[in-house]
């Protein structure tokens, strides 16, 4: 599984022959990529704020993976014809997306659409992406990535996401102000039980500027087993599980 961070909360995930793009927003200082170079099969949207759906119009051909409310808005306003299940999905559901399985999980945040915040986009969400369908039986050959969306600390991280979905890697919002900051992200790194954790949703604009060394220190202070990794913009991390498989 290949994970590329394009700044803010935008991630390009490759699982075998399937490409997924999460929260496309390329108007951020961490990326130099030309958005037109990406051709995702699936467009995963955690919520409707403009810094998470800012570039959805570039990917009309992708299948939308979002709540029914946000899916309907995207289809009506940007012309996307395809959506998982024809109408989107909701918290707790798992859908097959090509070679990947995507589970929608809860996030604690607000969720108006665009900058007016006048239209409901349903519940905010996070996603757990795996190369196998999650079951109650632990599968050491499964590789999983947790994108937390915009959120603060929540008990679901330790009660549901860690024991059931068992993420190998997690991307955690770290910029504070609108989400949890480095201290909260450090605790989250411990709670989700991942092997590696990445900071995201920081340094895009003034209220969320941080020193990423704080994130690294807070992960260690929390006693998390995870390795904190601070990616450069547009950098790719190849995720392998503990048995050396990257899901191929």
UniProtKB/Swiss-Prot annotation:
Database matches in InterPro entries: Metallo-B-lactamas, RibonucZ/Hydroxyglut_hydro, UPF0173, UPF0173_UPF0282_UlaG_hydrolase
Descriptive protein name: UPF0173 metal-dependent hydrolase Hlac_1347
Pfam families: Lactamase_B_2 (PF12706)
Matches recorded under NCBIfam families: PRK00685.1 (NF001911)
Upper lineage: Archaea, Methanobacteriati, Methanobacteriota, Stenosarchaea group, Halobacteria
Organism this protein belongs to: Halorubrum lacusprofundi (strain ATCC 49239 / DSM 5036 / JCM 8891 / ACAM 34)
Keyword Hydrolase: yes
GO molecular function, one term: hydrolase activity
Highest taxon, organism lineage: Archaea
The UniProt record lists the keyword Membrane: no
Family (UniProt): Belongs to the UPF0173 family.
Keywords in alphabetical order: Hydrolase
